């Protein structure tokens, strides 16, 4: 069995001017004009008299976050806004550990026990809509000139690597680059008609038993969260977006603004999951069954292909950690963009270096030879490192293969390496 993990870097080649990156989405959620737009749109749906935080207040909070962490990305900003919104919605100290911590801190500082902001409850949804609509705008106006060719190449890569056997595709990306590239390959989302209210929702039996599945553990533009603690799946992202907005006026299925209790605070991760504590999402459908299938897929695979992943999500990392120890023949193929020459000697000293992260996640050994004649350190497998720097592909640890030239180049030459 083969498992594919498509993460943020896998979508970059499909868009241009601008590209779909963390930086691009961060700039969008920081933009005062975006907050003015979505809050105005929200009021049109709910009525002008609705109580909601002003765009100016939301931007002030974001700027305050950035004053402490100037390089905060959109996930870090989401984390803080979600927690503020959780307390604003329900400040009772017995209703969540965050509320209790907040109340104790207020007592220690002699602060009044009031909410941190009026009308913040819907801000997490609007934050996620800024992200969703930014991606929809990219899909409308900024696709790469060879977008269709890239879809065909991605299709060919998956077909070549999966070799007609059982396979699972896990995508953390909200866009349509993965689903649009799977035509003819037999991958199933396993969303099935349920009733006239919820339309298409996950069929758990089909999903857990399908030989080929594709799933989105961080949510997707095609998802619409509903009031039965699940999502409805739409085949069209624009229609899904319209339904989410219509859900504000209760004219569509379910309840767009459904939130669920979490262990620490309320969980606002609904149709897409962001922030830095995503684990609460896996207590709700379809994410709960996604996580179960993901654990099974990784454990049952002989090869895992990882495209454009930063190795920053603990809920993925913990599932991959034992993979190489399950069978001596298991292997990992990682595709990323690494412009510098690889030495495989000192990279471990930088904990943020992707090579260092790979070593930590898979529990591999970092082997270095000391050349006493030259008084310097050399990689254990010198020929493989030389090949990697020359050709772009090589074995960096036992059974861990790395392609360093980026996903665009990989799609043009994957048959040379796999």
Give short role names for the model-derived ranges.
Residues 70-77, 89-92, 109-116, 135-147, ...:
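Residue-level signal for secondary-structure boundary elements
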Residues 44-129, 156-269:
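Extended, H/D-rich, highly charged conserved domains that either
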Residues 1-28, 32-57, 68, 207-209, ...:
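SIR2/sirtuin-family catalytic core signature
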Residues 125-151, 261-301, 305, 309-313:
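Alpha/beta-hydrolase fold catalytic core
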Residues 154-155, 178-179, 313-317:
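Short, well-ordered alpha-helical microsegments
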Residues 152, 192-204, 254, 286-288, ...:
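Short amphipathic alpha-helical surface micro-motifs
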Residues 12, 151-155, 174:
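Conserved glycosyltransferase catalytic-site signature
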